[in-house]
From Swiss-Prot:
<comment type="similarity">
    <text>Belongs to the MinE family.</text>
</comment>
<dbReference type="Pfam" id="PF03776">
    <property type="entry name" value="MinE"/>
</dbReference>
<dbReference type="InterPro" id="IPR005527">
    <property type="entry name" value="MinE"/>
</dbReference>
<keyword id="KW-0132">Cell division</keyword>
<protein>
    <recommendedName>
        <fullName>Cell division topological specificity factor</fullName>
    </recommendedName>
</protein>
<keyword id="KW-0131">Cell cycle</keyword>
<dbReference type="GO" id="GO:0051301">
    <property type="term" value="P:cell division"/>
</dbReference>
<dbReference type="InterPro" id="IPR036707">
    <property type="entry name" value="MinE_sf"/>
</dbReference>
<dbReference type="GO" id="GO:0032955">
    <property type="term" value="P:regulation of division septum assembly"/>
</dbReference>
<comment type="function">
    <text>Prevents the cell division inhibition by proteins MinC and MinD at internal division sites while permitting inhibition at polar sites. This ensures cell division at the proper site by restricting the formation of a division septum at the midpoint of the long axis of the cell.</text>
</comment>
Length: 84
């Protein structure tokens, strides 16, 4: 972080904000919150809304899944972006 960005209060990038949100959701799940199926549809809608700001996509162009194997959780996001 440079002194100038510190003094002017540089905005966080949307990717870093999204990453923090996903980390919070997964951490909440590990503690024993609600089942993962509850938030995945909402997460998918939010991802479509954010990506649609930059590229035209539909709900069918994105897939979100959470797989659990023993102590490992994998959140997988697949996005089909149309060719320009």
């Amino acid at each position: 972080m440079s002194i100038l960005s510190f003094l002017l209060g540089e905005k966080k990038k949307s990717a870093s904000v999204a990453k923090e949100r996903l980390q919070l959701i997964i951490a909440h799940e590990r503690v024993g919150g609600r089942p993962p199926a509850d938030y995945l549809p909402a997460l998918q809608k939010e991802l479509v809304a954010v990506i649609s700001k930059y590229v035209q996509i539909s709900n069918d162009d994105i897939r979100v899944s959470l797989e659990r194997q023993d102590d490992l959780e994998v959140l997988e996001v697949k996005i089909e972006i149309p060719q320009a």
